[in-house]
Amino acid sequence: YSKVPKKAFSVALSITDKIDTMVGFFGINEKPTSSKDPFALRRTALGVIRTVIENKKDLKLNDIIKYSSSLYNDQGNKLTNLNLQLELHNFLKDRFRYYLKEKEIRYDIIEASISSLSLNKIFSSYEKARQLNKIINSQQGVDIISSYKRASNILESEMRDNKIEINNTTDPGIFKSDFEKNLYKKIRDIKKYYSTINNDENFEKSLLILADTRKVVFEFFDNVKVNEENETLRKNRLEL
């Protein structure tokens, strides 16, 4: 890959020029096909993706696309493709997918990133994918997944077999053990943390905090009978 611009003015000029080029070609339906890309639009789009990511800053690409489209029309250059913005959005998403593959991000993480992608959050999405890819096969990743699976399997079974509704209304006043109290406190601490941070900026720390729940989650399930005969206690433990 060639170097991308780093100075603010150069970044702005590079991004707007590339998007303006793509808007013009997509606007007259001159788009790449599976076998042909005569105007190197795939390389142009990848240049936009790389410039955003390597400068470590989200940019409002959707707004730039809309503004560029309006300029063409205002200057009398009628764009005949009514699906221009959607098609260019999907094209850039596809280039982002390609970029993630080049960085050896796992397929399932790539697809999760693409499904929720906003063009205005490309760097944030990349960072999340990179951090998740890094942690998922580590011990911390194993801890996150095992904690989630153990809880979700019990919940799914109870909700399916006993038609119990979960309303997130845990009553700590009827806890019978410290294991319940410890899990309740851990959940409250995590909720408090997530309510006071920017998840996009603290993604790695957020994952590590989730991994840290394994001990208290497993102690709860190893020592507390969730499927209690007393319906009130059973529902409260499921709520927890």
Residue map of PLM features:
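Amphipathic alpha-helical "coupling" segments that flank catalytic cores
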Residues: Y1-L240
